[in-house]
Amino acid sequence: MRESVAASTSVAKPRLGPTHALLAAYLLGVAGTLWDWREHFLGVSSQAPHLVIDLGGLLAIGVLAFTGWAKISRAEITGFYALLALVALITLSPFVLMMSAPHSRLMAVFMQFGMTRSALGLYLPIVLLAGWAAWHWLGLAPVGAWRLAAALGVVVVAIASIWDLYWHQTHPLEMGASMNMMALPPHQLILAGFLLGAIGALAGVLRSGRQSHSRASPSV
């Protein structure tokens, strides 16, 4: 009888783990992408949805990279922190600049640089960091369908971000608040990446819950 009570208590209080955090990060990215689509559909140009998208991607990378941190060498840790700082600067500085000095000379220079091919190179560290984080996380346990989806979701988002910048460079006349973001292939791929990761993470959460329930169930 006591064993049954203890088992039911353990099932009633599930523990939150990295997979739950990964699911939350991907859902944040999905919410930011849909918010951005809605803003443009209504004819509103706002940077807040972009910040939510960036935070969702950075959080997903962070969860993948920091899980199993003890197994990473000191050199890898140093390289990761340096790359993470660079990626955070690349992704968040445009938002800060847009909010603090939207009409400044620095903002004008930044916008001009953003329309050059050299700007595409700035996004390569994002793909590199996302790929390394996914590879590290996949190496912590046997690779299954849900783990592969959860890890590759943010890699798809990173690659789609480069494609998005390239698309805007090659379609300069199709920019503005009224542009239908839902019709843009890069934006569709960004949403697909977040959804892929969210589905994989959700499958992992459900699988972990079933395993916990099986272990907690009384054998008699």
Residue ranges and their predicted role:
Residues 14-26, 72-86, 142-155, 217-219:
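Membrane-interfacial loop-to-transmembrane alpha-helix junctions, especially the N-terminal start
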Residues 53-69, 119-136, 188-205:
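Hydrophobic cores of alpha-helical transmembrane segments in multi-pass inner/ER membrane proteins
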Residues 24-26, 32, 56, 86-87, ...:
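Small-residue hotspots
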Residues 26-42, 63-64, 85-103, 132, ...:
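Hydrophobic alpha-helical transmembrane segments and adjacent interfacial helices
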Residues 19, 147-148, 158, 162, ...:
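An N-terminal structural lobe/cap that precedes and organizes the functional/catalytic core
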Residues 35-51, 99-117, 165-188:
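Membrane-interface interhelical loops and short amphipathic "cap" helices
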Residues 1-13, 211-220:
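Short, intrinsically disordered terminal tails adjacent to the first/last structured region
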Residues 66-77, 132-145, 206-214:
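Cytoplasmic membrane-interface regions of multi-pass membrane proteins
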